Amino acid sequence: YCVAHACIHHSSKPHNAILEMYRVSKKGILIIEATDSLISKLACRFNLSEEFEVSAVKKNKTYGGVDNSSIPNYVFRWTEREIYKLFSSYKPEIIHNIKYDYGHHLKFTKSLFIKFFFKLFFHIFKKQQNLLSIFVDKNSSNLTLRKW
């Protein structure tokens, strides 16, 4: 397996990074990255989250940005549809076995009330959470080829 947690968005070519993980793995890949949800977009709009990860470069002074440089990276946020299109373009002959799950990490508040509110909200609107886990099974016994 190949696993990446909150690091692909530091690449200047995040799509290529995922495809390279898939290429070198034998059994599959697991990725946990930011999701492109309405709530994430609103958080960026109201400066509760970053569109470009300036904080990482400020913290480290000379690195932590795109390709670990001093240039803040764009925080690429993913959707299920984008992952589907990526793998369908890369290996169109395969019906890919992709599983998704959602989670959240709220950095902007320590308020228990706000955290409780979001817990309820995310229970109802699961896909609005700010984290997306993606598992792509590459096990040959689970692969199905398209019937053209």
List PLM regions with ranges:
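Short glycine/proline- and acidic residue-enriched helix-loop micro-motifs
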Residues: 62-72
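Glycine/Thr-rich phosphate-binding loops of Rossmann-like dinucleotide-binding domains
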Residues: 12, 38-39, 105
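Conserved class I S-adenosyl-L-methionine
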Residues: 27-60
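Short alpha-helix
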Residues: 71-101
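A short His-aromatic
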Residues: 6-11
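A conserved beta-strand element that flanks and buttresses the S-adenosyl-L-methionine
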Residues: 3
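A short glycine-rich, Lys/Arg-flanked "PGG" loop and its adjoining helix->strand segment in the class I
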Residues: 15-31
